[in-house]
Amino acid sequence: MTERGGFEALDTCVHCGFCLQACPTFLATGDEADSPRGRIDLMRALEAGELAPDDPALRLHLDRCLGCRGCEPVCPSGVGYGRGIEAARALLATRRRPSALARVALWALTSPGTSRIVYALARMLRASGIPSWLAGWGRFRFAMGMLAATKGGGRRWKAVKGGERTPASTAPDRSRPPSSALLFRGCVMDGLFAHVHDATVRTLGVNGWAVREVPGQVCCGALHAHAGLREEARRLARANVAAFGDGAEPIVVNSAGCGAMLKEYGHLVDAAGFAARVRDVTEVLAAGGGPRPGAPVDVQVAYDPPCHLLHAQRITDEPLRVLAAIPVLRVVSFADAAQCCGSAGLYTLLEPAMSRAVLAPKLASLRTAAPQVVATGNPGCVMQLGAGLAADGVAAAVRHPVELLDESYRAAGYYA
């Protein structure tokens, strides 16, 4: 971390305005202060001492930032907006703690002891079916929809008749030992999306990877960094670096938000070697010749790229290559797919009105595209899109791409 703590990443901004149409909050409000360009002015003033940390306008517009980083790929000057906004939030957090709701959410979702109880209770509630019945608009009903969306399974698509057997040309190669990879489990993924971890291990196994779990790993620290709690994020980062050690094995992640954070450890705690090993599961599957083909699955899928996969990690084609390994499956395009869904970690809880405003145009586009499944690679996006679609009465499931590949492989006979 540099002496200026990340503010220097904003220095190259020349106020060209290319970022405006890439910013979901600017599109929602039309307010320059809710754009990256406007926020950079505010952050520069904060660093220079021209604005006090308790300035209401400063906090309003910085708190409204989703941190989606959609402005970064379109910026011709290479502004590191993501690092800048986290530096600003870290400075603000030294003067004012995050809100009570943010602190409670962090405690419930990421602290090891408490989160185990919280996730166990959430899984029990999810299994009861009550969240699905209560899903809708409004804070409580939307939260129920988010929980219902984490269930996974419940197949709404079928393998094409006659496609159940594995073609000889695609049978797993047992002539050489598998390569070794390490799985990063995370907190939300481990608590509510264990089925995605299982699908990750199985699909990687078909493609020649033996996946091991690593004891001692903890939360990636993304939610803490976004809240300005940089020292807590560093503590978690150091624990993960120590847990995974100095080997060369890739660290596989199936959460875009976690992956983006782990790849920032080089800047956060000078762990560039660790960061270089981090790979999204779709990167690993798509490497070389791409994933082995599975059985045909007759389903229409809309791929929604998570912001922290598309903008932060610049991963674009790999998830589509994973879906392309499923014969017959059709990927349909829809307008504004690259725009944020409004989830953004705790943002959907802390800024519900803006979160729903950002989500609205994406829901409208998905209604028009009419997919049977929306595929996306981040837990917050699965929950946000699942809750929004349910509230809107759209009968589309939301799944991680590896879940679809897993169904195809199961139908092909790679495993029972």
Can you say where each PLM-predicted feature lies in the sequence?
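Short, intrinsically disordered, charge-biased short linear motifs at domain edges
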Residues: M1-L10, L51-L62, G205-G208, I326-V331
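Non-heme iron-sulfur electron-transfer modules
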Residues: T2, F26-A57, G78-R103, A395-L404
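Cysteine-centered iron-sulfur cluster-binding motifs in ferredoxin-type domains/subunits
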Residues: F7-F26, R59-V79, A338
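Signature of N-terminal electron-transfer/Fe-S-associated modules in redox systems
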Residues: D11, T29-G30, A45-E50, D54, ...
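N-terminal glycine-rich anion-binding loops that anchor highly charged ligand groups
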Residues: G17-Q21, D31-P36, A210-P215
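Iron-sulfur cluster-binding electron-transfer modules in prokaryotic oxidoreductases
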Residues: Y81-A416
